[in-house]
Amino acid sequence: MDKRYTDSEYLFKNFLLSKLNLKATYLDIPDNNCFYLCISEIIKNLSLNIEKNINDYSNALIKNFYNCLIKDSLFREKQPAVYGALLSKLKDFLDSNKISKKELFGFLLDVRKRNSLSYFRMVFSEVESILSKETINNIDYSISIFNTFLNEIIARGTDIRFLNFSLSEMDTNPAFDKFINYVKYIAEVNPYNKDVLDILVPIKIDEEKDMFIEICDKRNQKYEIIDDTIYCKIYDRNTNDFFTLIEDQMVRISSIFDLIKLYTYHTPEFDSELPIKIKSKILNKEFEIPFNYIIRFTGNKPYSKHLYNTITSLDAAKETDIKFYHQVLNTLSYAEKDLSRKNSNAFVDNWIALETICSISEIKSGYEAVQFFVPKILITTIVRQNITSYLIKAYKNYFKDVKLEDFLKIITSENYEETLNKIPNTYNKYILLNWAKILNNPLNLYQYINRLQDKINIDILRIYILRNEYVHSCNLNAFQTLEFYKLKNIFNIVIDEFFRCLTNRKDKDESHEGIGFDIFNQFTYKWDIMLKSLNLMFKVEEHIYKSDTTKIVPDRTNMTIKLEGNLTYSDYLLNLLKNNNEILKKYIPKKDYKQKDEDLGILENDFINIFTDI
């Protein structure tokens, strides 16, 4: 451990390094579930349909907020009156519609006005309290508070790219000689934590420079000329987040470009070849950032190893289904625009690409197709990605490389906790121990998969709402960087899985439903097999999982696990299914077991392919 930090500070630092990595796996991207964002998105949605008795997204958003509040022990303890009243109102609306949309809207508006700032300060104080201790008393609670704190910061408008940039200053800048100073910097908790920023944004204009300068003067847009290049000046003392500040001001500067384009044949634009110059009072330095850091998304890409197989399969598909072929080309054309358009436009293009690829399934509504298929496509991949990423971080440079198969062998041994406790990094160890608890118990895994499905669905809904606001209301401020990172992460996995299924089609001839039907049928079949297998491993009645998590369960010591040869994720779960058949029968109602027994052979043949690392 870095001796500059206490145990609690080191935990928070590594939490941030994982969450703010711009190439993080889907499960590491901040989930946005916090008081300020949840209440604000409900208020906004209710305001659009407050007098109309129509089906909208309110119920899904309210249910998500309710579930978040149930887990918020800090809010419950520190502000019990507000917490209880808020929970009661949401429950009344969800369960029985005892209150109208209008009444709920007014109530939530008042709660946000009175309590949003006090809630944030309460969370910040709790973070301060945790960080003030040398040791970590309760790691689960600490991580939960850190999550809430980070989500609140992002929900209040701080760009994740700025937070990522700030990590590079944490260890080296004298302004953050005390770790709490860094925390105050990203949180902007008090006026004295606000920076003074001088920013120069380069402009490319070959002619009509005089006209541009004249318009700048009339619109009170400051500028400087350095080495014959015009720079528009941005000055601000109300924020630390220069990414958001620059993006906001670029909209204003672009209006000057538009005026010149409208009245002349000249096309001024931002000069992406030159860097943006920034001077920060808090950081006490002048520095430059590449222009593309502001206007381009940088993050994960689909796996390049699939490229050549995809090209071959796509060419073969062209011979049998020309409609399918053109749908795929349309998808790729929208996704590719990401490289040539600024983030807000690319956000919409990437949603169109996702809708287009999912609509190949023949579900008419693009949004409904995305909601139905994306969770089924994502879950096994994001679980595998997340575990693998933490294995790399936990073991690289410490011990030998540990792969997913090795990890599963470790967690099925009786002393797995002792083995994992040797991991030096507390946060990485915490994540892998949590995965061990989930994977070691079929019920835990089943419940986790259902929670994960809910998480993906609420992310998709938020992305869709932002897309609609941007497209239909022309609200340029609707774009949020964090949602774009999630959308890109989702799309990359979907396109990978789609082309992998296309490549692996056993029957290369056109089926009577079409190639697209074949591919999406594979996704739903795999999903059904996975859930049915987990049901057989533990219980059959799905509602029991959802309504009661305190049922007596088979003791882990009574579960036989035989490990032979190279173990994969699916082998591990399949061994549970095969070797505990008699034990599992006791937990399956007799009237249902005959049908389940008939399915067992199918499950054993197909389940092996679900979780394997591709």
Predicted regions and their residues:
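Short linear proline/tyrosine/threonine-rich motifs used for host-factor recruitment
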Residues: 554, 561-563
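N-terminal "leader" segments that precede or initiate the main folded domain
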Residues: 1-158, 163
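Charged, non-catalytic interaction/linker regions at domain boundaries
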Residues: 92-345, 352, 356, 482-513, ...
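Short alpha-helix capping/helix-loop boundary micro-motifs
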Residues: 593-595
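Short, polar loop/linker segments at the starts of domains and inter-domain junctions
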Residues: 598-602
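Amphipathic, oligomerization/interface secondary-structure segments
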Residues: 1-61, 303-548, 569, 573-584, ...
